[in-house]
Amino acid sequence: CRHFVDRDMHKMTGLGMEYRIDSSELLAARGFCQHWTESATCNTGDSFLTELTDIEGDVVDMEAYAQAFVCRAKEIPFISVKYVSDVIGQNSVKHWEDRLEDARAGLSHFFNVLKESI
């Protein structure tokens, strides 16, 4: 993900609060991820979603917006690589536990392929 939305901050846009971050410009300025064609959006919030709602984004988590915010403030390029471990509305705790090994293997493969291309 290169785009980040904070669903909690979105509720405060009337107060001038920012709720979107696009890290593409800083990544491009540093020459990172130029060959990546996919561009996903991560929706972040402080609550655990248990049902599908009308949210902006491709994946949901609870931390990426804050990470992107700090990295942007420090001018550090940031990208978030996510492995979807559960589906909103299903038994997420059980799915998460079952998928940990799959996530570990999938992310390991992703970073090994990435390392070979650098």
What is the meaning of each model-derived region?
Residues 1-118:
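Glycine-rich phosphate- or other oxyanion-binding loops that anchor nucleotides, phosphorylated ligands
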